[in-house]
Amino acid sequence: MSMSTSTEIIAHHWAFAIFLIIAIGLCCLMLVGGWFLGGRARARSKNTPFESGIDSVGSARLRLSAKFYLVAMFFVIFDVEALYLFAWSTSIRESGWVGFVEAAIFIFVLLAGLVYLVRIGALDWTPARSRRERMNPETNSIANRQR
């Protein structure tokens, strides 16, 4: 590497280096300033969690239903689908009919997956007993009278 090449690289990237130095320095200044100017109260009540004016009760380790994770996965999947379709829609003139067919196949595959999930009951939030009561209300009313 010759001297002129390294000088050119430094001349080309000096503004970014100054930006990084100032940003890191500003972050450090704010952290140190908060530490020096912040309160020093150390009491037992200061170490307890407090949220929205309510004292916490019980453990923070709650077991959530797997259906919440299922909804999160569906959101991510369909959000990524929307991103792909947005990228396709911005370049529709360049991609032409081939791009349209590819996007249609992509949508068809995702819709087939959605239909499959509906058919196996992955999107059904109600328990099986409640679903049966909703489907056959007359048989359930007879069963309830016999109890």
Swiss-Prot record:
It is an enzyme of class 7 (translocase). InterPro entries: NAD(P)H_OxRDtase_bac/plastid, NADH_UbQ/plastoQ_OxRdtase_su3, NDAH_ubi_oxred_su3_sf. It is found in: Cell inner membrane. The keyword DNA damage does not apply. The keyword Transport applies. One of its GO terms (cellular component) is NADH dehydrogenase complex. Its EC number is 7.1.1.-. It is a multi-pass membrane protein. Its main location: membrane. Gene3D superfamilies: NADH:ubiquinone/plastoquinone oxidoreductase, chain 3. It comes from the Bacteria. The chain crosses the membrane at residues 16-36, 68-88, 98-118. Keywords: Cell inner membrane, Cell membrane, Membrane, NAD, Quinone, Translocase, Transmembrane, Transmembrane helix, Transport, Ubiquinone. It catalyses: a quinone + NADH + 5 H(+)(in) = a quinol + NAD(+) + 4 H(+)(out). One of its GO terms (molecular function) is NADH dehydrogenase (ubiquinone) activity. NDH-1 is composed of 13 different subunits. Subunits NuoA, H, J, K, L, M, N constitute the membrane sector of the complex. Belongs to the complex I subunit 3 family. NDH-1 shuttles electrons from NADH, via FMN and iron-sulfur (Fe-S) centers, to quinones in the respiratory chain. The immediate electron acceptor for the enzyme in this species is believed to be ubiquinone. Couples the redox reaction to proton translocation (for every two electrons transferred, four hydrogen ions are translocated across the cytoplasmic membrane), and thus conserves the redox energy in a proton gradient. This is NADH-quinone oxidoreductase subunit A. It comes from Citrobacter koseri (strain ATCC BAA-895 / CDC 4225-83 / SGSC4696).
